[in-house]
């Protein structure tokens, strides 16, 4: 027992030393420098990412678009049929129901929470203080076999069941390369409400002077499986027709 306590004390001391040697401002600024610089990020008008998502033995084509206006969509192709998910036109949030194959509008609460993402394009950490966010180092953890700084980011509150709720996410930065390798967040709505979602990033490649992760993996902490995504191309400042975001009119 004494040995276990001694090990725990050493681990805590080491973690504290590592964290104190680097400030959260240094981590965030170094990260932004490593992926191309804050000014280049702030000049972005939009991104279009195309690739494939692995679902079991199937590879599903996927396309993700996000604009600085807040408009966004994710389009997935399943056996030749296209399904749009999390489509936001600036006012309405909607998705195609996989079972009925019909468009459905999201709840007012989900739409409000989703709309807050406009403030975070292309990166929630850009000008985070000016946005009123708070960031702090809460330790180090091992992510995919490598040490990473764990940064707690507190953003503007969201609504959960009609009540204003703290919006806290955890960002993990590789201690050597100082790039983002994982984001941890709580699922706030839907059948997985209350679960912890992990989004992992890797394979950073340059696109017109900025570096983006060409590999992502979305998973629920403690659950088997996941949804690895491999991007084949990333286009900056794409031209996208407004109709791509509009809720389909009734036939």
Language model regions located:
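Gly/Pro-enriched, hydrophobic low-complexity segments
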Residues: 79, 147-246
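N-terminal mature ectodomain segment of secretory-pathway/periplasmic proteins
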Residues: 22-101, 134-137
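N-terminal signal peptide c-region/cleavage motif recognized by signal peptidases
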Residues: 14-18
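Bacterial N-terminal signal peptides that target proteins for export
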Residues: 1-8
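Flexible, processing/modification-adjacent segments and terminal tails
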Residues: 21-29, 33, 40, 92-163, ...
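Short amphipathic beta-strand/extended segments with alternating polar/hydrophobic composition
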Residues: 62-66, 85-89, 104-111, 199-200, ...
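Hydrophobic beta-strand positions
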Residues: 88, 95, 140, 172-173, ...
């Amino acid at each position: 027992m004494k040995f276990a306590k001694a090990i725990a004390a050493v681990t805590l001391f080491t973690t504290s030393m590592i964290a104190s040697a680097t400030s959260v401002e240094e981590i965030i600024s170094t990260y932004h420098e490593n992926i191309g610089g804050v000014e280049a990020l702030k000049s972005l008008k939009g991104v279009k990412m195309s690739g494939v998502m692995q679902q079991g033995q199937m590879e599903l084509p996927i396309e993700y678009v996000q604009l600085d206006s807040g408009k966004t969509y994710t389009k997935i192709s399943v056996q030749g049929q296209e399904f749009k998910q999390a489509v936001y036109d600036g006012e309405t949030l909607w998705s195609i129901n996989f079972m009925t194959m019909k468009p459905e509008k999201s709840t007012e609460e989900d739409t409000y929470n989703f709309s807050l993402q406009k403030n975070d394009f292309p990166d929630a950490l850009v000008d985070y203080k000016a946005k009123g966010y708070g960031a702090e180092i809460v330790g180090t953890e091992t992510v995919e076999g490598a040490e990473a700084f764990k940064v707690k980011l507190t953003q503007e509150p969201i609504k959960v069941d009609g009540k204003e709720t703290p919006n806290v996410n955890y960002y993990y930065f590789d201690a050597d390369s100082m790039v983002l390798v994982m984001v941890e967040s709580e699922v706030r709505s839907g059948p997985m409400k209350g679960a912890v979602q992990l989004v992992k990033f890797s394979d950073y490649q340059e696109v017109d002077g900025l570096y983006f992760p060409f590999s992502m993996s979305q998973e629920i902490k403690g659950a088997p499986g996941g949804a690895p995504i491999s991007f084949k191309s990333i286009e900056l400042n794409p031209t996208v027709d407004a109709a791509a975001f509009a809720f389909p009119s009734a036939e």
